[in-house]
Every structure is written in structure tokens, then in C-alpha cells.
Amino acid sequence: MVNIRPDEISSIIRKQIEQYNQEVKVVNIGTVLQVGDGIARIYGLDKVMAGELLEFEDGTVGIALNLESDNVGAVLMGDGLNIQEGSSVKATGKIAQIPVSDGYLGRVVNALGRPIDGKGDIPASEYRLIESPAPGIISRRSVYEPMQTGLIAIDAMIPIGRGQRELIIGDRQTGKTAVATDTILNQKGQNVICVYVAIGQKASSIAQVLNTFEERGAMDYTIIVAETADAPATLQYLAPYTGAAIAEYFMYRGKHTLVIYDDLSKQAQAYRQMSLLLRRPPGREAYPGDVFYLHSRLLERAAKLSSQLGEGSMTALPIVETQAGDVSAYIPTNVISITDGQIFLSADLFNAGIRPAINVGISVSRVGSAAQIKAMKQVAGKLKLELAQFAELEAFSQFASDLDKATQNQLARGQRLRELLKQSQAAPLAVEEQVATIYTGVNGYLDVIEVAQVRRFLTELRQYLGTNKPKFGEIIREKKAVTEEAESLLKAAIKEHTEAFLLQEESVGSRS
């Protein structure tokens, strides 16, 4: 038998007494009455707050949304398959927040800020609330810096500024995501941090976007927040707010950010599902009464901050899907009324081969030329007017048999301008290239080129300018205006290239 020394026992007891800590914890606990379809009804939890996080026995987390007289309705951030009726629920006393840091750049995370790209944990420097209040009037200043998308049709006629909210709206398969991803690709070297939020999309579509970003080196300044179509409705509803919280972290540090919500129709559907299961009264199109507030509190977080707050900005490009071009449906009208303009993509234009399929007539930017550099204002003013007149004339000319020479010339010019706006996907243009392209079109230099050859002519002209007249690009970038020197350089380049191009066409024609 082992000898037990009394002094050893007494020292152990003394140590235990010294370390004894009498701490009383008050925990608010409830009982699950009913669970299913991502919703739990809980009895008890008298002191719970709206939006408070709840912890279930199996570790699942929920959010208390409905506070009723005899029970609490909570939405689950998980499948809830292991939650049983009668099990206990703990109120955590916290509301939803996510870790944030510079380490998020180049990563793919879910709506709770957890990495899902298999590259390990992300070190967090601080936590931010998923839903935080938008900056007030005094905290903001008006939008004045351009946010170049790299798409001529947008930068010339529907300009977007840093801190603006511009809706991208259109039917399915009209190139909405392409416009948004091209804008991200164009931010390379512009010191803009991009957040792409994918809500309820196919995993294959998100993988495709990620692949494009990686190939073009865009992941260096981009964060992807993704919740796929098979994710619980709660997480699809939270994803946009998470994206906004990550962007806010950078915005309040004086950086410029761009957030794309792809798309808010799916978020509204997820919220409708949650609300109907919580038995909230349905309104128009079965959406709950506060679906406007769902989007307004998200989009109001986009801002251009005042100089006292560091002049950071958050530009939001929400995407909304329409059914058969119906812009007057509930969600589209809501988001149109919240945003500072919309880019309308038309299925008819897309099918006619006009891509990006932007309907310039319906699209508008409420910030306007305040978000353009002087060089763009100098050349783009004429473009919108000429295209509007062309659209009118084209409709009229279908019924008229003989047209006078002036009308024929105007129609020919319009067709060339329409060609000028066409761009391939993932090929955004620098602002100096856009200025040169538009100048060539509106000043009639394309009138001698066949319509079918316009795109090739312009591509070669841009290459010619960059190689033989690099001074032009430097002037536009530095002075941000078309000076006399820049104009003479551009005119010389157009003249030289046109002569060479027409000679080449003649020789090809004579050979065939």
C-alpha cells in the first residue's frame, strides 16, 4: 500500500481553496417546441433581444427574429437536423458579427466570414457587426470621383462614381454578372478593394467567376463571399450584409471599395421563405411588408465618406433579375427607387449580338457627369445624343421607302456608333483607350469604314496609338483632359491608321 503523506494532501487542498472562484452566471435558457424548415419555435427566453444569436444543444446557431407573447421564432444557420423538440436553447447575449482583417484579400468566405476555399484559417484583427448603421448625412460628401468600369457604354453614358449605388437589372442570361466582373477586372492597379457577393448561385458559376479572377490576377484585391443555392435561407439572407461589413472595414480605413451583390432577387426570395415560415403576414407577391427595408438598409451603407472620416468610399453594384423584362415588378421597383440609377440589360439586344446588351434609352445614372473626367465629358456628350436620334430614326426608317441623304448619313453614323460600343467579355478598356475610341466615332472618322470592319479597325487603332503615340495616353492620364496636343496626336494616329487599314482592305479585296 502506498504511503499517503498528510502534508501533501493538505497542500493540494490549500491550492484548490486558493484557486476556487465563486462565479455566478445567469443564463437565459429556453426549450424547443417545434423545429423544421430552418425555423425553430422556442418557449422561454423571456429576456431575448430581436436579432440576438441563440445556441442550440447540438452547437447550431440561430437568430431570434419573431418575439411573440408565448414563444420566440428563430431562424437557423444550419440544417438543424440534430435539434430535437424539448432540447434546451441558450441566449448568447450577442448579435451576428464577423471577424475582419486585411488577410481576407484573395479569399473565398461564407456568410459567417469563415473560409471555404481550403486555404486555412484567416487571422482576424477585429470583429464587425454584420448589420451596422449606415453613415449619416454629415459623414458623407457628394460623389465626384469616377469608378471606371472599362465598358465604353457605361463610362461614357451612364457613368458611375465612387460611393454611388448603381443597379444592374435584366432578364436571366443577359450578361449582368459579366458587366459586374468586368468592372472588378478593370480595378487592377486602381487601389480599389472589391467584394463579390454570390447569393444563391450554382457552385459551378461561382467557381467560373473565381477562375476568371485568378487568371487575370484580380484575386489580389478581391474577396468573394459565397452562399450557394443549397445553403440555408438564413445564410443567403445574411451574405450581402457580410459583404458590406467586410467592405466597411476597408472603407473606414480610407480605402476605396466596390461591392457587387449578385443578386438581390435571390436574397429577397430567401427572406420571403424565412418570413412565411415564421408566419409573418405576406404582402405583394407574397413578400413580407419590410422587404423594402431589407434592401434599403443594405444599400444605404454605400457612401463616399467626408474628409474627417478619411475620404474612403463604398460603391455598390446590386444585381436584380427581371422576368420577361418586367421592370415594374415589386423587387425591381424597390431597388430602382433606392439606387442612384440603373443599367438595364435587354435580352433582345443580347440576342441581336449587341454585347454588353445595355439599353441606353432606359439606363440612367443620377450622378451623371460629376463622375467623369474632363476628357470623357469632352467626347461623350455627343455620343448619347447621336445614339438617341439614331434609335428614333431607325424605327422611323423601317416604314419610309426613300430617305434623303442627310438621314442616310445619320443612320450610317448610328450603326457605326453602335458597333463602337460592342466589347468582348473580360476585355475592359483603359480610359484613354475609351476616349480615343469615342472621339473617332463621334467625329465621323468611322464613316469611311465598313460597318462589319469597325470593331477590328478600332482594336488595331488602339494598339497603334499605344505603340506609336504613347504620349496621348500619358496626357489623358495626367491632365485628365483632351488637350490640343493630345487631339493633334490622336488625329494624326487616326489619319495614318485609316490610310494603312483602307490600303490593306483594298489589297485583300483585289486578291479575292
From Swiss-Prot:
- CDD domains in the record, alphabetically? ATP-synt_F1_alpha_C (cd18113), ATP-synt_F1_alpha_N (cd18116), F1-ATPase_alpha_CD (cd01132)
How would you classify this enzyme at the top EC level? translocase
State the annotated membrane topology for this chain: Peripheral membrane protein
Recorded E.C. number(s)?
7.1.2.2
List the catalysed reactions.
ATP + H2O + 4 H(+)(in) = ADP + phosphate + 5 H(+)(out)
Q: Which UniProt keywords apply?
A: ATP synthesis, ATP-binding, CF(1), Chloroplast, Hydrogen ion transport, Ion transport, Membrane, Nucleotide-binding, Plastid, Thylakoid, Translocase, Transport
What does the UniProt entry say about where the protein is found?
A: Plastid, Chloroplast thylakoid membrane
What residues bind ATP, as annotated?
Answer: 170-177
Disulfide bond annotation, renumbered to this chain = none
Q: Which GO terms describe its molecular function?
A: ADP binding; ATP binding; proton-transporting ATP synthase activity, rotational mechanism
Coiled-coil ranges (or none): none
Record Pfam families: ATP-synt_ab (PF00006), ATP-synt_ab_C (PF00306), ATP-synt_ab_N (PF02874)
Where does it primarily localize?
Answer: plastid
> InterPro entries, alphabetically?
ATP_synth_asu-like_sf, ATP_synth_asu_C, ATP_synth_asu_C_sf, ATP_synth_F1_a_nt-bd_dom, ATP_synth_F1_asu, ATPase_a/bsu_AS, ATPase_F1/V1/A1_a/bsu_N, ATPase_F1/V1/A1_a/bsu_N_sf
Query: Which residues are marked as site: Required for activity?
Result: 363
Entry-linked SUPFAM superfamilies: C-terminal domain of alpha and beta subunits of F1 ATP synthase, N-terminal domain of alpha and beta subunits of F1 ATP synthase, P-loop containing nucleoside triphosphate hydrolases
The GO cellular component terms are: chloroplast thylakoid membrane; proton-transporting ATP synthase complex
Summary of subunit composition and partner proteins: F-type ATPases have 2 components, CF(1) - the catalytic core - and CF(0) - the membrane proton channel. CF(1) has five subunits: alpha(3), beta(3), gamma(1), delta(1), epsilon(1). CF(0) has four main subunits: a, b, b' and c.
Q: What does this protein do?
A: Produces ATP from ADP in the presence of a proton gradient across the membrane. The alpha chain is a regulatory subunit.
UniProt similarity note = Belongs to the ATPase alpha/beta chains family.
Concerning PANTHER family, the annotation shows: ATP SYNTHASE SUBUNIT ALPHA, MITOCHONDRIAL
Protein name listed in UniProt: ATP synthase subunit alpha, chloroplastic
Q: Which gene encodes it?
A: atpA
